Amino acid sequence: MKNKFLLTTSILGILLFIASFNTTYGQKKSHGAANKNFIAANWKLGVQMWTFRLFTQQESLEKTANAGITFIEAFPGQTLDKTGKEVFGINMTAADRKKLKGFLKQHHAKIVAMGVISPVNKEDWIKAFDLAKEFGLSYITTEPIKTHWDLIDSLAGVYNIKIAIHEHPKPNVYWHPDSVLAAIKGHANIGACADLGHWARSGLNPVDCLKMLEGHIYGVHLKDIVTFGNKNAADTIVGKGVIDFAPIFAELKRQKFKGMFSIEHESNWENNLPDVIETVQFYNEQLKKLQ
């Protein structure tokens, strides 16, 4: 009888262990799948077209396609193609816009954002929002003058297109998150475009900056630099410079960031597509580690 009791107890113990293991494993697996699904659904990888500023928009779209990227952040002033002098911007004609839509369709690409722009008056801001609406943009990257904060917040609400304040290095007025937060205060449609490289150039820890701007980040400029705290530091391939990206991605995951990472590579201008492709690979590797 005693042996039978011990056997029964042992079997029950084993079954409880198996059940506990399966529950724990299932929870971890479910949590990992949820993380993977959230990132896949809410994180976009794109290219800030300034990266290919030496080329036309048509050529740049071909390059982004070769890098496996379909999302872009357009910049004003980029020539559309080699047939003329038409450029991307608020004064594009209907014919220019139709041409650009054709290029986008050809490469299955979408403009998610544009910038960095700083219109000087209400009329130009309205033109900017009209252009953004026509191409289905999510946000406009800008460094607006203070007297325009109320105006652009109002327009952003009307057009349902967010304003993302960019941060060039000091002495730019927006070099520190404090100044961006000042613009955000009382303006529900104004947030931030987190430029990781420029923060590092200004001697700021990007993770600390992200924490300060939690809940207000609409986009990220994904770049790396060779020297911390030097506003003239050169760009390098993301992951090969001074910026530690693992905690950056972890922090954005913690914040449940929803938006686009725009690769902005301001180096090797004439032949930087391989650098962009390497950045894409680095980004994908980092995402695997998050899951």
Give residue ranges: language-model regions:
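Glycine-rich, proline-tolerant flexible connector loops at the mouths of alpha/beta enzymes
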Residues: 74-99
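Aromatic/hydrophobic pocket-lining residues that form π-stacking "cages" and hydrophobic walls in ligand
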Residues: 60, 100, 128, 152, ...
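Histidine-acidic metal/acid-base catalytic patches
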Residues: 3, 26-49, 53-71, 106, ...
